[in-house]
Every structure is written in C-alpha cells, then in structure tokens.
Amino acid sequence: MKKMALTMLMGGSLAAQAADNLKFHGTLISPPNCTINNDQTIDVKFGNLLINKIDGTRYAQNVPYEITCDSTVRDETMALTLTLSGSVSDFNPAAVNTSVAGLGIELRQNDQPFTLGSTITVNEQSIPVLKAIPVKKSGASLKEGGFDATATLQVDYQ
C-alpha cells in the first residue's frame, strides 16, 4: 500500500510540468537630470518701493525661470516637482525673510501662496507662473534702505 501511494505522488508531479509561457521584459532608466535656469541664479529686481504702499499686492514681479531636462525618456509614474526652501518669515509661511525686519518676499504659484518647505507637482510642458511680492508684517515700521533675500527653488523627478 505504501509503494502504491508513493508511485501516485510521483506520477502527479510529472504531469504538472509545462513549458515556459510567461516572459518578462522592460527597460531600466534613470530619472532625467533637470535644472532650473541652467543652474544660474534668478535675480528678481524690485527697484524702489514706497514703504507705505507695500500691501501684499503691489510691486509683484514675475520670477523668470525655465526647467530643462536632459532626457526625453519618462516613466509615467514619476512626477516632476518643485520645492521651495529658505528662511521663512515669522509672519507669513509663504514669505522669505529679508534683511529688513518686518519685510518678507511672498512667493505665489499661479496666484496661490507657495509655502516655503512645500513641494508642488508640475507639468514640464506648462510650468506654473511664479511671482514674488513684497509683504509687510502687520504693525511693522519698516526702515528705509536696501533689502535682499534668498531662497532655493529645486526641481526633481519623484
């Protein structure tokens, strides 16, 4: 009886053999290397601003930038993203600190605040319009003189 059971098990395993009928293939790619403005600094000049006219809408300047990627090969599951970083003002999460206390530079993408530390998904063929707008802390008394500020705009495929 034991011999017959063993024979049946072995016979069953031989009948289960089949030819390969699945093939897997693809192409391994690296994410494209993308840059903003060919890695050149973007300089936004405001010129002379009247202290009492800084209201968060006046003096808006477009941030001129372009995104260039070194490869046209894409993975549809990957997203092109922009990340904004810098020293955040103490009165507006979308404003970069400036060298003048109480003055910040707010960045907006498509007229919406672009909060520092945040990441947005963008379309390489239709990048968002970025604007820089001087903003003043409520109740602040700004001092006359020059100002400057810096931030970092980074592009990635994720």
Predicted regions, residues:
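Hydrophobic h-region of N-terminal signal peptides that target proteins for export
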Residues: 9-17
